[in-house]
């Protein structure tokens, strides 16, 4: 809406992406901070609490009555801010909104099933959840491939030339990236604030890349792929950062609310989508290193047990391993945040080292 105010009234300030990104950040933050206490009160009244996994560390049992599905509030706030501040005739914005809303709706259904069933395993089956994730990923990826300026070239970090052209197979590759990122953040969301802050850092880094790739002068100077229109996604990233910060106000230890799958699946999917839209699919390994670390711990744990009948970790994902070893929750969370900061600083060096 703000961009169209500029077009109608020639109010120049709203033509700038950075200005509209600033507005989207504050709108999403303020809306989340305003609505979240109301949602928490409603969720408590309806007993919409997070079922705790039976095998989770004993310290988690005290969280049994904590409301969940907070993701509905902050994703809703981010979408609202985007509708106000971004250009809705931009294919990257449309794809982003489809991604956020689609994955959040899937997460809501999963959360609702768990609440109604009363147990953590009463959610959607892994196959059903994966099938819907893949379907949404394919729709979003196809939209970008057939209607966007993204192209299908594949880039490696720290290398300025495209490695190869994936052609139509880019749709499959992008879908894998989006779904993998969605599930990685979902696995990480096991401690108060553990997923939120690394997600904020990831979105900040990807927002920088999106702004530069969408800028004709900066992208040429820094030898990044020039992608017309992708700079508009900075507004969505800013909205999501703002809403996540608003959510963190209530989710920091001890949490008053959990994001649930309604939030984690959507946030992860959008991080993956931003990696796709900025041609940083492989750099996502560094940008989202905490999420990768958590996911690999699960893969290694399951693989080791199936093949060798032995467990590598006391429990997976790896944050549970440290809990069982006796680390207090805050120590695990802050140390993982520090890892996320360092990883994203390393990722940002790809702007100059090419």
Curated annotation (Swiss-Prot):
It comes from Campylobacter curvus (strain 525.92). GO terms for molecular function: metal ion binding; phospho-N-acetylmuramoyl-pentapeptide-transferase activity; UDP-N-acetylmuramoyl-L-alanyl-D-glutamyl-meso-2,6-diaminopimelyl-D-alanyl-D-alanine:undecaprenyl-phosphate transferase activity. Keywords: Cell cycle, Cell division, Cell inner membrane, Cell membrane, Cell shape, Cell wall biogenesis/degradation, Magnesium, Membrane, Metal-binding, Peptidoglycan synthesis, Transferase, Transmembrane, Transmembrane helix. This is Phospho-N-acetylmuramoyl-pentapeptide-transferase. InterPro entries: Glycosyl_transferase_4, PNAcMuramoyl-5peptid_Trfase, PNAcMuramoyl-5peptid_Trfase_CS. Pathway: Cell wall biogenesis; peptidoglycan biosynthesis. The chain crosses the membrane at residues 23-43, 66-86, 88-108, 130-150, 161-181, 193-213, 230-250, 257-277, 282-302, 331-351. GO terms for biological process: cell division; cell wall organization; peptidoglycan biosynthetic process; regulation of cell shape. Its cofactor is Mg(2+). CDD domains: GT_MraY. Its EC number is 2.7.8.13. NCBIfam families: mraY. GO terms for cellular component: plasma membrane. HAMAP family: MraY. The keyword Amino-acid biosynthesis does not apply. It is found in: Cell inner membrane.
């Amino acid at each position: 809406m703000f961009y169209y105010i500029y077009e109608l009234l020639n109010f120049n300030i709203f033509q700038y992406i950075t200005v509209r990104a600033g507005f989207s950040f504050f709108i999403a933050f303020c809306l989340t901070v305003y609505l979240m206490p109301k949602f928490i009160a409603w969720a408590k009244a309806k007993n919409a609490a997070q079922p705790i996994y039976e095998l989770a560390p004993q310290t988690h049992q005290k969280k049994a009555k904590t409301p969940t599905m907070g993701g509905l509030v902050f994703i809703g706030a981010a979408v609202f801010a985007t509708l106000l501040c971004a250009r809705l005739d931009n294919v990257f914005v449309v794809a982003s909104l489809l991604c956020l809303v689609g994955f959040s709706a899937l997460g809501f259904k999963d959360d609702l099933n768990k609440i109604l069933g009363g147990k953590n395993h009463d959610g959607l089956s892994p196959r059903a959840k994966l099938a819907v994730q893949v379907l949404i990923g394919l729709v979003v990826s196809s939209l970008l491939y057939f209607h966007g300026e993204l192209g299908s070239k594949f880039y490696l970090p720290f290398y300025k030339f495209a490695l190869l052209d994936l052609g139509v197979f880019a749709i499959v590759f992008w879908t894998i990236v989006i779904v993998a990122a969605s599930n990685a953040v979902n696995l990480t969301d096991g401690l108060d604030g553990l997923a939120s802050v690394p997600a904020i850092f990831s979105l900040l880094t990807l927002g920088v890349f999106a702004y530069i790739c969408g800028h004709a002068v900066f992208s040429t100077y820094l030898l990044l792929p020039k992608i017309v229109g992708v700079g508009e996604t900075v507004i969505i990233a800013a909205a999501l950062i703002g809403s996540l910060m608003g959510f963190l106000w209530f989710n920091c230890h001890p949490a008053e609310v959990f994001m649930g799958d309604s939030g984690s699946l959507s946030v992860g999917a959008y991080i993956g989508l931003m990696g796709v839209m900025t041609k940083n699919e492989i750099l996502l390994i560094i940008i989202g290193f905490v999420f990768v670390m958590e996911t690999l711990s699960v893969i290694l744990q399951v693989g080791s047990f199936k093949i060798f009948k032995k467990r590598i970790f006391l429990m997976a994902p790896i944050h549970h391993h440290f809990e069982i070893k006796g680390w207090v929750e805050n120590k695990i969370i802050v140390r993982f945040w520090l890892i996320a900061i360092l990883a994203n600083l390393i990722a940002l060096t790809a702007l100059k080292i090419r």
